[in-house]
Design a protein with these regions (language model features):
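Short acidic, low-complexity intrinsically disordered linear motifs used
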Residues: 351-369
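Low-complexity, glycine/alanine/valine/leucine- and proline-rich hydrophobic stretches
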Residues: 237-240, 244-299, 304-306
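Secreted, luminal/periplasmic, and some membrane-associated catalytic domains
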Residues: 33, 44, 48-249, 258-259, ...
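Polar, surface-exposed loop/tail segments
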Residues: 191-193, 201-229, 290-293, 297, ...
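Intrinsically disordered, low-complexity regulatory segments in eukaryotic proteins
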Residues: 339-357
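A conserved hydrophobic secondary-structure block that centers on an alpha-helix together
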Residues: 5-7, 37-40, 45-47
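Active-site regions of oxyanion-processing enzymes, predominantly non-cytosolic
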Residues: 1-17, 234
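Aromatic- and acidic-residue-enriched carbohydrate-binding clefts of CAZyme catalytic domains
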Residues: 16-33
């Protein structure tokens, strides 16, 4: 697995892209080829691998990315601000309201967040992750909630978002600690209301409507862990448009960030939905092009190439367009029950050393802050 292509795009995009608002010609002259050079090195290593495998004549190679990359632009969507404007989320007043415990939690959380921001760029992700584990779980959970929702009045909140992704949760009675929305009809009607109204959000500076669609979670996902997903998933023009409203006090739930706000961000490139899929080998159609491939199609395709049956419950399908006609034959499907799985799941445990290794790997990839 290669992670350098991800990291370099996040941190060097502004030097590579003349249309980026923070593009500087002098900096570009020094760092502008950094992304290209990383890809060149990856290409050379892939070439070396193919040279070794070509002699065998029976090996297929798939090059896959889980997403693409693009400019982290000035567009911003503040979901909690929009929810508040619809009367669906309440904020605590800024005049000292709230219990003493709430005030102390908020002060502690803000102090922790300021400390984390001052450490980013100075200390490795792995070290920060180890420091976090020194804190009691209960304290981390409480401060984490305050970091995401420092000003939310839960008694007047029917829906909310952590604002870092296109996710909306319903403050459901019986599930959430201070839930006020009744399961059943009230829950369904509230989701319907948000689905109908949110795509009408307009950025007044550009006239654009950045929300493409709002999905119910069961429209996109299924399985025994569906309840862990947000109640609604918001699809926008770009996945990086969702931003915490933070210190922004204006009325615009969709807006353009000013240069000073953009300059505060360490990353200048972000993910895009379209990644890459490149296939090479004796079973592949030379010069073929795929128009409707998705990431979930990779696993069933690999299983088929290995001569293994594909579970009927698995998402995705075999990318037959990429295969020679003779390689498409012999496609087999099988139920999980036939494979011996009863649907109850498998209990997996790690030693402390294994768990530490997994955490460090995830931190090194940037998934743990």
């Amino acid at each position: 697995m290669v992670s350098a292509t991800d990291g370099v795009a996040h941190f060097f995009w502004k030097y590579h892209d003349p249309t980026h608002p923070l593009y500087d010609p002098e900096e570009a002259a020094r760092y502008g080829d950094t992304i290209l050079e990383v890809y060149r090195r990856c290409d050379r290593r892939i070439g070396e691998l193919l040279e070794r495998l070509e002699a065998s004549g029976d090996c297929n190679v798939l090059v896959v990315s889980d997403h693409g990359q693009g400019q982290l632009g000035p567009q911003a969507i503040h979901l909690n601000l929009w929810l508040a404007q619809q009367g669906l989320l309440g904020f605590r007043s800024n005049n000292g309201g709230g219990t003493l415990g709430e005030k102390l939690n908020s002060l502690a959380s803000h102090a922790v967040q300021r400390g984390k921001r001052s450490l980013y760029g100075r200390i490795r992700f792995q070290t920060l992750t180890k420091l976090r584990r020194l804190w009691p779980d209960s304290l981390r959970t409480r401060l984490g909630a305050e970091a995401f929702f420092p000003d939310v009045d839960w008694s007047h909140t029917r829906a909310y978002s952590e604002e870092l992704r296109g996710n909306i949760w319903i403050n459901l009675r019986g599930r959430d600690p201070q839930g006020i929305v009744e399961p059943g009809k009230e829950y369904d009607l509230l989701r319907d209301q948000i689905i109908a109204d949110l795509p009408g959000l307009v950025d007044p500076q550009t006239g654009a409507r950045p929300i493409r669609k709002v999905w119910r979670r069961e429209e996109l996902f299924n399985g025994p862990y569906l309840g862990r997903f947000p109640d609604l998933i918001v699809e926008a023009d770009y996945p990086d448009m969702f931003k915490p409203h933070g210190a922004y006090l204006g009325p615009q739930a969709a807006r353009q960030l000013i240069p000073e706000e953009m300059a505060q961000r360490a990353i200048t490139g972000c993910h895009r939905m379209n990644g890459i899929f490149i296939a090479w080998g004796p079973d592949m159609t030379p010069g073929g092009r795929l128009n409707d491939a998705a990431l979930i199609d990779v696993a069933p395709t690999v299983l088929h190439l290995l001569g293994q049956p594909i579970p009927q419950e698995m998402d995705g399908h075999v990318l037959s367009q990429a295969l020679r006609p003779e390689a498409r034959a012999g496609l087999r499907t099988v139920s999980l029950a036939e494979l011996g799985f009863d649907g109850a799941g498998v209990e997996v445990s790690f030693t402390d050393a294994e768990a530490d290794y997994v955490r460090e790997r995830l931190a090194g990839l940037g998934y743990l802050g």
